[in-house]
């Protein structure tokens, strides 16, 4: 079967949940036995989100091949349990970069380079590249909102693709808002009508309309939307607000959403096996206990900055049959005077990754509190580096211990800038210095790690060799390896050549572990990551009330 393409657009306003909708449809089609992939096309001019402020963009999601991508790729991987790659996320910046590179190389033979056909052709090439892996279905999410000027080339490209591929291989789904006005006591369809009108003016007639709403819309409203938007009544579906995002595939299935897609694209009509999803949702709905985890960072005002962390902690809760309540703590506000009060009642503390000095001292105070008060602690990326700094200062007595990132004049730079390493394929040496560009210049992607036996890390993984995803410029300074080991720090994960420290832990603590990589990027609800599973287990076993 030739690959079928499903294009998902959004209207009225942003943040309606196109990524979750795409991931949920993908999960349903995969449950039917189909091979599925998903792509995100982002209209912004940045080449990738790697240098974007988390407060503006949210989390940067890293794939195995080192691509810095939109957080929606995290949804795709978690719902499909399939790895994404660079080809699953393109931006206007990356598309234009390709076009300009070709123009400079002379590929256009002196022709005038224009949005149509050159930019739109490059977008189409990006979409069609998904077919190289022979999926049965490829879902393509168009970022932004219909009507945004920067999204026009992408909409024009997917309009052309229906003509290129044929109607039997393309399907357009439009996600829109149907607000409920409590004062009037009714849903309003006018925003949807105008959104579809805008889409049709571009040349795209949606085949299915998905209505984001607080409560399911009635049959009468579906008839009205179908009439004004020129679709079949049975092609109008509700996307109702849910308490747990993992309910969405089940809600779509109850609506017959995947069945309609299968009929319209003439896909094999095998009934989906949704038992794993039903079990997952039931486990979340009926926990056998609760734990409270504090996430101490500086991006806490935008929860999307820690999206994969949030989900990985939920997965850890599922593995332990407990609900995970999250408390976000701003590390910039933590002082020696208030640290105990700020962290009171937490069953576990997690210090996530980040960049820059702002908020770091609050993280270090947090880690000292967790170490001294035997609170289960998990440090990720910068969180691990801060744990090393805290240990050097307060256990080894190196009062000026710091990271080269924060204080280049420190005499004890226990964390320093990596200047040379193999790429994630181990095929080439990467070299950087302090003057290198910021974008795409970190140690990125999946790298192997050797886990030391008889450690908490090995107890969690159960194997010696693992692969985890990285996103960092700074690394543990091996000059302090022996001194720290003699002071009680255990280096439980190393690169295969032994040169890079990947995991640290304290053996005389209920659970104190830091890792240089980002394990949250490899967790999904059906297979919770081992470190998150064990972290939540420790929080459950050593709750605040028993310490």
UniProtKB/Swiss-Prot annotation:
HAMAP family membership: PyrG (MF_01227)
Annotated GO biological process: 'de novo' CTP biosynthetic process; pyrimidine nucleobase biosynthetic process
Ranges for region Amidoligase domain: 1-267
PANTHER family documented for this protein: CTP SYNTHASE, CTP SYNTHASE-RELATED
Lineage: Bacteria, Pseudomonadati, Thermodesulfobacteriota, Desulfovibrionia, Desulfovibrionales
Native source organism of the sequence: Nitratidesulfovibrio vulgaris (strain ATCC 29579 / DSM 644 / CCUG 34227 / NCIMB 8303 / VKM B-1760 / Hildenborough) (Desulfovibrio vulgaris)
Residues that hold L-glutamine according to the record: 354, 382-385, 405, 473
Positions of the catalytic residues: 381 (nucleophile), 518, 520
Name of the molecule in the record: CTP synthase
Entry function: Catalyzes the ATP-dependent amination of UTP to CTP with either L-glutamine or ammonia as the source of nitrogen. Regulates intracellular CTP levels through interactions with the four ribonucleotide triphosphates.
Amino-acid positions noted as binding CTP in the UniProt annotation, renumbered to this chain: 14, 148-150, 188-193, 224
Other facts: CTPSs have evolved a hybrid strategy for distinguishing between UTP and CTP. The overlapping regions of the product feedback inhibitory and substrate sites recognize a common feature in both compounds, the triphosphate moiety. To differentiate isosteric substrate and product pyrimidine rings, an additional pocket far from the expected kinase/ligase catalytic site, specifically recognizes the cytosine and ribose portions of the product inhibitor.
Pathway: Pyrimidine metabolism; CTP biosynthesis via de novo pathway; CTP from UDP: step 2/2
């Amino acid at each position: 079967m030739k690959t079928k393409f499903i294009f998902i657009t959004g209207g009225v306003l942003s943040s309606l949940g196109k990524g979750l909708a795409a991931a949920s449809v993908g999960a349903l089609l995969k449950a039917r036995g189909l091979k599925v992939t998903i792509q995100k096309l982002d209209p912004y001019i940045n080449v990738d989100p790697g240098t974007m402020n988390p407060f503006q963009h949210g989390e940067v999601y890293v794939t195995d091949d080192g691509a810095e991508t939109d957080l929606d790729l995290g949804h795709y991987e978690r719902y499909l349990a399939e790895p994404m790659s660079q080809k699953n996320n393109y931006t206007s910046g990356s598309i234009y970069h390709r076009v300009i590179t070709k123009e400079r190389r002379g590929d256009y033979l002196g022709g005038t380079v224009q949005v149509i056909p050159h930019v739109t052709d490059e977008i189409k090439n990006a979409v069609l590249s998904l077919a190289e892996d022979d999926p049965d279905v490829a879902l393509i999410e168009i970022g932004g909102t219909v009507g945004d000027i920067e999204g026009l080339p992408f909409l024009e490209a997917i309009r052309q693709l229906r003509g290129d591929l044929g109607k039997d291989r393309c399907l357009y789904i439009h996600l829109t808002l149907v607000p409920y006005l409590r004062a009037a006591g009714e849903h309003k369809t006018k925003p949807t009508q105008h959104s579809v009108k805008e889409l049709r003016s571009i040349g795209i007639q949606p085949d299915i309309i998905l209505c984001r709403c607080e409560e399911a819309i009635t049959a009468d409203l579906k008839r009205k939307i179908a009439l004004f938007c020129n679709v079949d009544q049975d092609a109008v579906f509700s996307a109702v607000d849910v308490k747990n995002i993992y309910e969405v595939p089940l809600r779509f299935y109850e609506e017959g959403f995947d069945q309609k897609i299968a009929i319209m694209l003439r896909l094999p009509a095998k009934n989906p096996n949704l038992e794993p999803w039903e079990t997952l949702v039931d486990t979340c709905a009926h926990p056998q206990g609760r734990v409270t985890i504090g996430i101490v960072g500086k991006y806490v005002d935008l929860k999307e900055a820690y999206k994969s962390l949030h989900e990985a902690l939920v997965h850890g809760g599922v593995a332990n049959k407990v609900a995970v309540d999250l408390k976000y703590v701003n590390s910039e506000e933590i002082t020696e005077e208030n640290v105990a009060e700020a962290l009171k009642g937490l069953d576990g503390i997690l210090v996530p990754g980040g960049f820059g000095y702002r908020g770091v001292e609050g993280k270090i105070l947090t880690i000292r509190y967790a170490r001294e008060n035997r609170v289960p602690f998990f440090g990720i990326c910068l969180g691990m580096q801060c744990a090393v700094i805290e240990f050097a200062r307060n256990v080894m007595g190196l009062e000026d211990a710091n990271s080269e990132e924060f204080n280049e004049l420190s005499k004890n730079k226990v964390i320093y800038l990596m200047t040379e390493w193999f790429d994630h394929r181990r095929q080439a040496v990467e070299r950087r210095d302090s003057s290198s560009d910021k974008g795409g210049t970190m140690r990125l992607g999946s790298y192997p790690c050797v886990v030391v036996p008889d450690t908490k890390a090995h107890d969690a993984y159960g194997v010696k060799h693992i692969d985890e995803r990285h996103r960092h410029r700074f690394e543990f300074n091996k000059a302090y390896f022996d001194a720290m080991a003699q002071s009680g720090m255990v280096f439980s994960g190393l690169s295969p050549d032994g040169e890079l420290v990947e995991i640290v832990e304290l053996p005389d603590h209920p659970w104190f572990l830091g890792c240089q990589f980002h394990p949250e990027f490899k967790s999904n609800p059906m297979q919770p990551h081992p470190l998150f599973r064990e972290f939540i287990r420790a929080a459950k076993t050593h709750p605040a009330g028993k310490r």
